[in-house]
Amino acid sequence: MSHNDTIVAQATPPGRGGVGILRISGLNAKKVAQTVLGKLPKPRYADYLPFKDADGATLDQGIALWFPGPNSFTGEDVLELQGHGGPVILDLLLKRILTIPGVRIARPGEFSERAFLNDKLDLAQAEAIADLIDASSEQAARSALNSLQGAFSARVNHLVEALTHLRIYVEAAIDFPDEEIDFLSDGKIEAQLNGVIADLDAVRAEARQGSLLREGMKVVIAGRPNAGKSSLLNALAGREAAIVTDIAGTTRDVLREHIHIDGMPLHVIDTAGLRDASDEVERIGIERAWQEIEQADRVLFMVDGTTTDAVDPGDIWPDFIARLPKNLPITVVRNKADITGEMLGISEVNGHSLVRLSARTGEGVDVLRNHLKQSMGFDTNMEGGFLARRRHLQALAEAAEHLEQGKAQLLGAWAGELLAEELRLAQQSLSEITGEFTSDDLLGRIFSSFCIGK
């Protein structure tokens, strides 16, 4: 589909509501205004007008807002019609607009896409719009707004600027060896490179926090039947989300709860008790349990403390530990401390965390909550943060790898050409976050800021 088309879409959620909004963007937005409203409203003023059908009959009446480009969200001419929120009324108005030549229904996200293509937003800001809408906590909403206002992009652009400056010196030393420029060996390049690496590490740490706010942590509660898995789910959720009985195998399918711990989203999954089951339904539930375990960020290995004194997961159930994916973090949860009399709290056993609690009474559950938060490195005191997506983390990781490779080339062999290439690749990875990378970016900067002939 062409970006020269004029697009229209409903900007408010489907269904009944007090107000329904249609948004139009493109070259023919002016024609839509003149056809449906009979006039072109004064720019950026609210105008109360009837919305007319082709035969002149009034379909609805409401507020019309006219934003001529480029001073609009998309950078194009934009018309916004705010009428009553009945689905029939909005559908009639939408059908009327679509009869105007050159107007079509917008694709999902196309208004934001046009804003990006017209340099009204960079890619990270455009993504932040969706993140702000989908935010599931106050902290996530604030961080998404920070990203929309350019906080993340500013950090990335600062790194790109520093890399551009560094590349100027490196490439000058390579291309003009007779000009007595010896930046490769006098320590300046190394010092600047170390500074960029340190700044990148700081951005990566913030991005990991932002990713946690957006993606959350997937925690699977697993163990034998009657270990108290469903009771723990209820304790973490603060409500009776799962049925709890003394009958082994009560939970036969996956149960999911979405909760927050001091702003960090947590996807808690209760699974069927793991055992050799003859019942077909229970067997399917156990298969699903293993599927969830394999995709988890952390497994809470639930142990009935009344059945064993062991604390090492390898001693408690070696077959279970052997089947777990390699490097999957495990927290052993010894349950029923109210019966065994064990001291509540957390400790370390052979590289695994061990939490003693009572899911039935709730004692020790706060210790587990804090452990989950700390195990993911979540900082509840983070101010002015931003949201980040998995692709952002990947791009930052790639940039960090290129910088470390470049540093190795600099210190190991004084290989300026290889260093320059790693710096270029690092800059490209960073610029992919904002969508601003072009291969010609560096050329103009070199000739405008560095006097070679001096």
UniProtKB/Swiss-Prot annotation:
GO biological process, one term: tRNA wobble uridine modification
Protein name: tRNA modification GTPase MnmE
Cofactor note text: Binds 1 potassium ion per subunit.
Sites where the protein binds GTP: 226-231, 245-251, 270-273, 335-338, 358-360
Role of this protein: Exhibits a very high intrinsic GTPase hydrolysis rate. Involved in the addition of a carboxymethylaminomethyl (cmnm) group at the wobble position (U34) of certain tRNAs, forming tRNA-cmnm(5)s(2)U34.
Binding sites annotated in the UniProt record for Mg(2+): 230, 251
Subcellular compartments: Cytoplasm
Coiled-coil residues: none
Binding annotation for K(+): 226, 245, 247, 250
Known partners and oligomeric status: Homodimer. Heterotetramer of two MnmE and two MnmG subunits.
PANTHER family reported in the protein's UniProt record: TRNA MODIFICATION GTPASE GTPBP3 (PTHR42714), TRNA MODIFICATION GTPASE GTPBP3, MITOCHONDRIAL (PTHR42714:SF2)
Named cofactor requirement(s): K(+)
The protein's enzyme class: hydrolase
Protein species of origin: Salmonella arizonae (strain ATCC BAA-731 / CDC346-86 / RSK2980)
Enzyme Commission designation: 3.6.-.-
Keyword annotations from UniProtKB, A to Z: Cytoplasm, GTP-binding, Hydrolase, Magnesium, Metal-binding, Nucleotide-binding, Potassium, tRNA processing
GO molecular function, one term: metal ion binding
